[in-house]
A protein has these predicted regions:
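Short linear sequence motif anchored by a di-proline
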Residues: 1-184
Length: 184
């Protein structure tokens, strides 16, 4: 499952996106953002709901191990119903998936094929996040059997603020939303 994605925008760009979508912005001084690939245990820019708007923070990817297993980085959306205060968005410029069962596996980058920012639906707990996953759309299905829940910019507000579980947003992204390029 997804264990690497890229964020390649400046703090200011994320704040501008949030303002355009009338999400408001409440954040501390802009920190030095990681640029490029984000892997489990590393910090990423996460947008979450806040009183009167939203926040932009740097949070580490992964929850503590559960039942002796490794870091929890992905959660099946079919088994979750996070309340608004536990939802977030990880803006992304691309994510990576692997195909094959034996090394060396083929590595594919998936980037937006549409001219708008995309973000992953995430669950936030104790200042850490995990990606929510769903069935793959046709853009991803040939490479992997799951994909991150990918939200279009117009859906960010509903994901962050809906008092009821927005099950419709947990569906796979529309076909043609992503383009794949083999990188290895």
């Amino acid at each position: 499952m997804c264990n690497e994605f890229a964020q390649e925008r400046a703090w200011r760009e994320y704040c501008e996106m949030m303002t355009r979508e009338a999400l408001g912005i409440f954040s501390d001084e802009p920190p030095e953002l990681p640029f490029g690939s984000v892997r489990p245990s590393e910090r990423a820019a996460i947008i979450s709901a806040a009183p009167g708007g939203s926040r932009l923070d740097l949070l580490p990817w992964g929850w503590p191990p559960y039942a002796g297993k490794g870091l929890v980085i992905n959660l099946r959306s079919e088994k979750r119903k996070e309340p608004p205060h536990a939802r977030g968005i990880a803006p992304m410029d691309r994510f990576y998936e692997y195909r094959g069962t034996q090394p060396p596996k083929s590595k594919f980058a998936f980037a937006p094929a549409i001219n708008e920012p995309l973000g992953f639906a995430v669950a936030v707990r104790d200042g850490k996040f995990a990606l929510l996953t769903t069935e793959p759309n046709s853009d991803v299905a040939e490479i992997h059997d799951r994909m991150p829940v990918t939200l279009r910019l117009a859906d960010w507000r509903a994901w962050l603020t809906s008092e009821t579980w927005p099950a419709d947003l947990m569906a796979p992204a529309d076909a043609g939303t992503l383009r794949a390029v083999q990188v290895r």
